[in-house]
Amino acid sequence: MDFKKDRINMVDGQTAKKTVFATGIGNAMEWFDFGVYAYTTAYIGANFFSPVQNPEIQQIFTFAALAIAFLLRPIGGIVFGIIGDKYGRKVVLTTTIILMALSTLTIGVLPNYDMIGLWAPALLLLARILQGFSTGGEYAGAMTYIAEISPDKKRNSLGSGLEIGTLSGYIAASIMIALLSFFLSDAQMEAWGWRIPFILGLFLGLFGLYLRRKLEESPIYENDVETPARDNIGFFTIIRYYFKDILVCFVAVVFFNVTNYTVTAYLPTYLGQIVKIDETTTSVLITCVMAVMIPLALFFGKLADKIGEKKVFLIGTGGLTLLSIVAFSLLNTKSLPFIILGVFILGFFLSTYEATMPGSLPTMFFTHIRYRTLAVTFNISVSLFGGTTPLVNSWLVESTGNIYAPAYYLTAISIIGFIVIAVLHVSTAGKSLKGSYPNVDNKKDLEFYESNPKKALWWIKVKKNKNA
């Protein structure tokens, strides 16, 4: 392969940061919706599953609606992944945010069971399915886009900005529910108050659409657009040649999302039902821990750019292997300072994943197959192990009677993650994306790669004997 110096991408760092903000808005909206849903499960259950008298069973049905929607994410990943690889990243990102906004609004205006009977839970499920389908393309597309527009040496620190959107969206949801719960009675919340955040989510989506329409296509995608291998590559061919990378990506997404959904979706329920903390205190506690996670994620993102994301992965998986049971033990002391410490331990190690996943997962695949492979792998993993986490944890506690069952589940997942990452993952921090010339933001790096073609195109040796 002839080395062409003019294909090294000079990226403006400030422009990249603005782009991360525009892209992260979609993630903020996704998690605003998810956060509101998690905090209002009791009200949603009472409105859409009212024939079921047991509140705990209502909650399981409500979580089941969420879990079923997650099963649609791989289909969304396939559809939007193929479109994103063939027609560009921008077209997908503008489409998914529209669909997410519409599905969020729909939940807020749906009639309840007393009004339309079985149509109520059926339409709720359809709205969640649309949400799952659109988010199947959203997050993978956002990760891919940010990785492709970021300077290689800042990919993890800028990629962590996507997860800042996650945390900000969830914090906004938590604050809104806390304010509504403070000003409205429980009866008012159940009757109509829970709908307000879902309706307001439409405006967040419109703001995100406004910003995303101004985005430019990623330079790496445009430079690769004439690659003959772009078309007619089947998923079985991709699996055949990139099985190890797909396996590492799959496992990484498992331990990331089991931890993520345990903290963000299941912990509020656990603190309320098991630990017996009131809803307002739970909301404030989770919100404060997530606020602390924002600077932690930024710190670990910068650290990953310096020492490699593999070491940061191992900090997270190793820490949760050792301390998950400790954290849940602290939660069950019933002492608020120890409860805060327990939640903080989980949030601290989750922030290592928040910092590194967006910047590292896209590096596992070559440009012409990156979006679709990442989208399908990510969403199958999320569907099986992420969205089902609240349901699995609720079922484990209900069926075993053991309040530490969620800690055992998290520990087991972390052990598997630690082993797979330690043995199979190769750090790509600071290196160009596979199949692409480097992204640089200064003259020094540009001159270095111009005089060191093998460093610039390090991935050529990886692609030897691979035809996909």
From Swiss-Prot:
Residues passing through the membrane, by range: 20-42, 63-83, 91-111, 115-135, 164-184, 191-211, 246-266, 284-304, 312-332, 336-356, 376-396, 403-423
Keywords: Cell membrane, Membrane, Symport, Transmembrane, Transmembrane helix, Transport
The keyword Repressor is annotated on this UniProt entry: no
GO molecular function, one term: symporter activity
Localization, UniProt: Cell membrane
GO CC term, one of those recorded: plasma membrane
Chief location category: membrane
Membrane topology: Multi-pass membrane protein
InterPro entries: H+-coupled_symporters, MFS, MFS_dom, MFS_sugar_transport-like, MFS_trans_sf, Sugar_transporter_CS
Protein family (similarity comment): Belongs to the major facilitator superfamily. Metabolite:H+ Symporter (MHS) family (TC 2.A.1.6) family.
Biological role: May be a proton symporter involved in the uptake of osmolytes such as proline and glycine betaine.
Name this polypeptide is given: Putative proline/betaine transporter
Species of origin: Staphylococcus haemolyticus (strain JCSC1435)
Gene of this entry: proP
